[in-house]
């Protein structure tokens, strides 16, 4: 075009000039690229002939000018092309796997479009290509049916990624039912160990044992090591075995029982002389009182600020008792001191009213909650009315009347709170939380703690009937 001399394509001088141009490429052209290597255009698909010559004596060029990037690329099927494509596969850019969806690309349908030919070979002397360009990821994959494809697919099945077990653990919640059946039988773990086992395997994310020995009832695993005594979990709060519960009794039962009896009398006097309660029949009064006397008494004792202390009775030493009995048989009975005779009687009397520490702690927690709220006298009275008039009790015949009494009591309590408190909604929520704690107090525990040393074997239902009929 310009009348200048240029080297022939395919000559040594042409290759040197083109390689120099590739090294001294401008930075602007590199920035314009999309960040990925160019794989050439369709011009490189022309086959390279062996030792044959083209017409005119020109040698076939191993490189061609790409229509996309303007650079020279090796022609497909040549030795240089095979070497470059094999070198590109191990040095894949690190950004490509991040763009994937967390799983390797398995190729597209182009891999099965051109079947591999056996020993006959392709027409026109072309060698079959073992790789193809994927339409999804842009990388080259082995064609289906080749030896390379079989090797890669078998390797992908065996070498599963390490992220798979972590994602699969979320779907293994159904294994809890199987674990429960395995450890729940008589040959399985104990109740506490089973719950701890399920907690560690599911919540904490530890490895679950693969096998369970039927003879020993303990989990067996290859990675499991014998647990040290320090690693054994402590007994949880839900364990109701007798060895876990602490049994306690009143430290001063006479004073506490007298104060509780006085509180019960004031409670029944308050209930009995309510005008809306007096018009009810006696059987309906009994239904209300027999079901609500314990919560009403707790409110009364909290209003009176009853403080009581508990203590644990130490276990008797069997060996010491045997030695004492043997000494009395050989040496004769010794004159016992007054203090020595009174102490065993007090311990034996107290030992008959031992209660679980958790049940007594529920009563103390309710007292502390009421004392922290500084409930006044009217609030205590309205709370007692809310507890007394419970329309959900079985055996009530005048349900609508009791419902109206409870609703009216709650309305009066709300009006009182609005008048006395600026933030009445918070105060109402605090009082409701105190009433909620009454659900955890058992009436049998209240009877054994405060009244069993006084009434003996008499039931509290008979006591309620007698107190309602008597003049208080």
UniProtKB/Swiss-Prot annotation:
* Spans annotated as Disordered: 214-238, 324-343
Task: State a single Gene Ontology molecular function.
Answer: RNA binding
Q: What residue intervals hold the motif LXXLL motif 1?
A: 13-17
| Key words, A-Z | Cytoplasm, Nucleus, Receptor, Repeat, Repressor, Transcription, Transcription regulation
Q: Where is this motif: LXXLL motif 2?
A: 80-84
GO terms for cellular component: centriolar satellite; cytoplasm; membrane; nuclear speck; nucleus; ribosome
Annotated NR LBD domain ranges read: 190-471
Instruction: Note the Pfam families from the entry.
Output: Hormone_recep, NR_Repeat
Annotated sequence repeats reside at 1-67, 68-135, 136-202, 203-255
Q: Where in the cell is it found?
A: Nucleus; Cytoplasm
Q: State the source organism's domain of life.
A: Eukaryota
Task: Give me the ranges of the annotated region 4 X 67 AA tandem repeats.
Answer: 1-255
InterPro entries under this entry?
A: NHR-like_dom_sf, NR0B1/2, Nucl_hrmn_rcpt_lig-bd, Nuclear_hrmn_rcpt, Nuclear_receptor_repeat
Check the record and name the PROSITE patterns matching this protein. Answer: NR_LBD (PS51843)
PANTHER family xrefs? NUCLEAR RECEPTOR SUBFAMILY 0 GROUP B, NUCLEAR RECEPTOR SUBFAMILY 0 GROUP B MEMBER 1
Q: Report the family membership.
A: Belongs to the nuclear hormone receptor family. NR0 subfamily.
The subunit field of the Swiss-Prot or TrEMBL record says: Homodimer. Interacts with NR5A1, NR5A2, NR0B2 and with COPS2. Interacts with ESRRB; represses ESRRB activity at the GATA6 promoter.
What the protein does comes down to: Nuclear receptor that lacks a DNA-binding domain and acts as a corepressor that inhibits the transcriptional activity of other nuclear receptors through heterodimeric interactions. Component of a cascade required for the development of the hypothalamic-pituitary-adrenal-gonadal axis. May also have a role in the development of the embryo and in the maintenance of embryonic stem cell pluripotency.
In the record's own words, the domains note is: Homodimerization involved an interaction between amino and carboxy termini involving LXXLL motifs and steroid binding domain (AF-2 motif). Heterodimerizes with NR5A1 and NROB2 through its N-terminal LXXLL motifs.
What is the protein named?
Answer: Nuclear receptor subfamily 0 group B member 1
Q: Which organism is it from?
A: Mus musculus
The record lists the lineage as: Eukaryota, Metazoa, Chordata, Craniata, Vertebrata
């Amino acid at each position: 075009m310009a009348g200048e001399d240029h080297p022939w394509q395919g000559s040594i001088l042409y290759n040197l000039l083109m390689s120099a141009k590739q090294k001294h490429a401008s930075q602007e052209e590199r920035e314009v690229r999309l960040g990925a290597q160019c794989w050439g255009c369709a011009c490189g698909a022309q086959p390279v002939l062996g030792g044959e010559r083209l017409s005119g004596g020109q040698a076939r060029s191993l490189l061609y000018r790409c229509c996309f990037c303007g650079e020279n690329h090796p022609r497909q099927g040549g030795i240089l092309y095979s070497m470059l494509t094999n070198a590109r596969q191990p040095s894949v850019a690190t950004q490509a796997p991040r763009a994937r969806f967390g799983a390797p690309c398995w190729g597209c349908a182009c891999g099965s479009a051109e079947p591999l030919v056996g020993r006959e070979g392709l027409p026109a002397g072309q060698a079959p290509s073992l790789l193809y360009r994927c339409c999804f990821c842009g990388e080259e994959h082995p064609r289906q049916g080749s030896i390379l494809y079989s090797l890669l697919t078998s390797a992908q099945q065996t070498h599963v990624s390490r992220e798979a077990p972590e994602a699969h653990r979320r779907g293994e919640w159904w294994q809890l039912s199987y674990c429960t059946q395995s450890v729940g039988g008589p040959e399985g773990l104990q109740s506490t160990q089973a719950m701890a086992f399920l907690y560690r395997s599911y919540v904490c994310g530890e490895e679950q044992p693969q096998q369970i020995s039927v003879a020993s009832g303990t989990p067996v695993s290859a990675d499991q090591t014998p647990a040290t005594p320090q690693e054994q979990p402590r007994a949880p709060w839900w364990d109701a075995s007798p060895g876990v519960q602490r049994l306690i009794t009143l430290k001063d039962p006479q004073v506490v029982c007298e104060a509780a009896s006085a509180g019960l009398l004031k409670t029944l006097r308050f209930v009995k002389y309510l005008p809306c309660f007096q018009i009810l029949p006696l059987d309906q009064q009994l239904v209300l009182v027999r079901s609500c006397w314990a919560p009403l008494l707790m409110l009364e004792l909290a209003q009176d600020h009853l403080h009581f202390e508990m203590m644990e009775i130490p276990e008797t030493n069997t060996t010491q008792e045997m030695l004492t009995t043997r000494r009395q048989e050989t040496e004769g009975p010794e004159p016992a001191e007054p203090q020595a005779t009174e102490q065993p009687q007090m311990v034996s009397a107290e030992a008959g009213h031992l209660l679980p520490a958790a049940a007594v702690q529920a009563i103390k927690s309710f007292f502390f909650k009421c004392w922290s709220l500084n409930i006044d006298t009217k609030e205590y009275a309205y709370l007692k009315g809310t507890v007394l008039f419970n329309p959900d009790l079985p055996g009530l015949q005048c349900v609508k009347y009791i419902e109206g009494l409870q609703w009216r009591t709650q309305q009066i309590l709300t009006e009182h709170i609005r008048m006395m408190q600026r933030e009445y909604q918070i105060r109402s929520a605090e009082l409701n939380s105190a009433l909620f704690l009454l659900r955890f107090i058992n009436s049998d525990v209240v009877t054994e703690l405060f009244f069993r040393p006084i009434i003996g074997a008499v039931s509290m239902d008979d006591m309620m009937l007698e107190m309602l009929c008597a003049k208080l």
